[in-house]
């Protein structure tokens, strides 16, 4: 994985190599922290817009929540693509008939239209999961050094 961001490249590749060790939400937060280092002026919503979510098309039993993360540059901005093993419309956890998963497994020179279409829904679904998780995990709504609203 090559990046044009000099000294930050080892940090990106180290995160990409070890991403399987983290849970779904930990991985998203780590990737957002990495993007925050690259773009300190962006807010959480703008950083979250730099993430792209996909489902893993593999039919094998997943060994972790996150399959992989890849960092890429698009329109001069560093972005991240996360591939998850949980909650997908194709792959091992799919609620759809196996036909769709088998069709999503195939690759051709111009890509896979079935996978690309269903990934639109995966992206939207996974974009909703982190705010829901944060809402019901009181401790993650605070950053270090902050004082809670109840104490003000």
Task: Please give the residue ranges for each predicted region.
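The feature captures two recurrent sequence modes
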Residues: 1-94
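Alpha-helix boundary/capping detector
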Residues: 13, 147-148
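Short, hydrophobic/amphipathic alpha-helical patches that form generic packing surfaces
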Residues: 25-34, 119-131
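Short secondary-structure junctions and interdomain/linker hinges
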Residues: 35-38, 42, 107, 111, ...
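Long, hydrophobic/aromatic-enriched structural stretches that serve as scaffold segments
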Residues: 74-129
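Conserved small/polar residues in nucleotide/adenosyl-binding loops
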Residues: 150-152
């Amino acid at each position: 994985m090559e990046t044009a961001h000099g000294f930050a490249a080892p940090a990106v590749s180290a995160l990409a190599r070890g991403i399987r060790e983290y849970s779904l939400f930990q991985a998203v937060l780590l990737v957002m922290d990495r993007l925050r280092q690259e773009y300190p002026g962006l807010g959480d919503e703008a950083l979250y817009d730099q993430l792209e979510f996909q489902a893993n098309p593999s039919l094998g039993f997943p060994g972790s929540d996150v399959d992989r993360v890849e960092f890429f540059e698009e329109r001069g901005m560093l972005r991240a693509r996360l591939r998850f093993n949980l909650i997908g419309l194709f792959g091992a956890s799919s609620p759809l008939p196996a036909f769709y998963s088998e069709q999503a497994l195939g690759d051709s020179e111009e890509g896979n239209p079935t996978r690309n279409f269903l990934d639109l829904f995966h992206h939207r679904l996974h974009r909703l999961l982190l705010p829901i998780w944060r809402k019901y995990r009181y401790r993650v709504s605070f950053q270090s050094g902050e004082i809670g609203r109840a104490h003000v």
